[in-house]
């Protein structure tokens, strides 16, 4: 859910058809245009994930699109939709997608273990996560870096 000035949406010409990453693409384009983006420190929307959710069924593909968009952003460039599609097509395969999805399960299980104070299970899921997918570890690393430097 977004709150923003109409002029921001107009100048950016709204959302683009960037598969699986429309919000992320919009946010980085806004930053490149000099707008400030921020999060509220309170929950205003609860989102329920289901196994059929597009965010889950295409999780690795979404990660790849995000990587490409970020790579272009780090060069202070707006990602081309066509180039992003070609990048994903080149790097996506079912073996890595399955590993990534499995790593996501271990990660979420580990988070639940912390919440439930199941520390032995947390260690087990954490260790399994370490060896499940190098791409998922990269996602965690990127998240930590953004959190530290934001």
Regions found by a protein language model. Name each.
Residues 49-150:
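C-terminal subregions of glycosyltransferases and related glycan-biosynthesis enzymes
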Residues 1-67:
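Conserved nucleotide-sugar donor-binding catalytic segment
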């Amino acid at each position: 859910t977004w709150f923003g000035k109409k002029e921001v949406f107009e100048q950016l010409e709204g959302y683009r058809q960037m598969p699986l990453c429309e919000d992320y693409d919009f946010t980085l384009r806004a930053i490149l245009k000099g707008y400030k983006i921020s999060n509220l420190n309170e929950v205003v929307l609860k989102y329920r994930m289901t196994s059929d959710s597009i965010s889950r069924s295409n999780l690795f593909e979404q990660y790849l699109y995000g990587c490409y968009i970020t790579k272009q952003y780090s060069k202070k460039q707006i990602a081309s939709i066509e180039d992003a599609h070609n990048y994903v097509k080149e790097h996506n395969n079912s073996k890595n997608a399955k590993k990534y999805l499995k790593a996501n399960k271990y990660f979420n299980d580990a988070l639940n273990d912390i919440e439930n104070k199941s520390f032995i299970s947390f260690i087990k899921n954490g260790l399994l996560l370490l060896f499940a997918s190098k791409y998922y570890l990269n996602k965690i690393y990127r998240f930590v870096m953004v959190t530290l430097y934001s």
